[in-house]
Amino acid sequence: FPVILSGAGVVIGGAIKDCVKLAEKLDSPVCSGYQHNDSFPGSHPLAVGPLGYNGSKAAMELISKADVVLALGTRLNPFSTLPGYGIDYWPKNAKIIQVDMNSDRIGLTKKVTVGICGDAKLVAQQILNKLSKNAGDTDRQKRKDLIHQTKSAWLQKLSSLDHEDDDPGTVWNKEARSRDKDRMSPRQAWRAIQAGMPEDVIISSDIGNNCAIGNAYPTFEKGRKYLAPGLFGPCGYGFPSILGAKIGCPDTPVIGFAGDGAFGISMNEMSSCARKEWPSITMVIFRNYQWGAEKRNSILWFDDNFVGTELDPELSYAKVATACGLKGVTVKTMEETTNALKQSCEDQKKGITTFIEVILNQELGEPFRRDAMKKPVEVAGIDTKDMRPQILKNG
């Protein structure tokens, strides 16, 4: 059961078409690395979506069945291989062929059977030329049927997935839904966004909970369409990177995404992008009034307690945009979100920059690195039973 995992190297190396040819030769499902959804055409029958944090459950289920994985142009970073949806999907007994330009990355995070230091495009072409005429014929139709069934089941599930689960012993998400019944959840917002994005759009994603929840939603037909901070993980990346994308591709619609915490780090550029010589963009700001990733860690490991994660609910980024001479819009429903996004992309053609403030409830997605932390255990405390009388000696 061959599986291809396509990474950033496929995009950077211009290897997407070669990856497609290789996948079609083998009828192999193609998973994308975390936030590299543009590394394989999303409409292709063999595309099964991104692995990693809040990725495609179909991709996870299919790669778990692999007996050989071609990791093409990827360093196999932890966000692309960590368990998701309760599935520890990495195929530990499969033969792993890792292709990366940097030899230091080969075998760094996962045990590999064959390591190839090289360009993804050239290596894909060479592998394809070396394959036998009947390569991939074993169980070919069975494999194609399984890919279709698994992918269809996941897309149906994703289209109706509205809310985030709580961990045992915590109730934050349940209370968030109850507290703000009239507000969209992050997943509802992402479905609305998906419905409003132009086909040829370039997007950027900041680091953070609400942006990462959207990992499974965007699909692309071409490369260099999805800008993401990667493992460096800097808050404040989404806004300046989408400005750069528009400067580089002035005739292409662009949309940046950021949570309200991360956006605050780079919001000073709102005054810069209002200048006439700057191209117009759309910037979406998820407004849930909290540092979500930090809060999810806190409530998970400290029994629904948190500190230092709250943001000012009185601040309006839409009003700040208006004050800077830009267009600021606040949306509260899925329909408003879709319509505002469509309008903003049309407005880009007229030289109008739009900041869309999306009001959400306070549901929180999975912790980014559940594997990296453990619930704290009290090793010492203050208890009268542990104390002994202090004897004062005279003199």
Enumerate the predicted regions with their spans.
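Short internal beta-strands
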Residues: S28-Y34, I97-D100, M283-F286
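Anionic-ligand anchoring segments at beta-strand to alpha-helix junctions in alpha/beta enzyme folds, i.e.
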Residues: F1-A66, G196-P240
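Thiamine diphosphate
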Residues: I63-K65, G107-T109, G115-C117, K121-Q125, ...
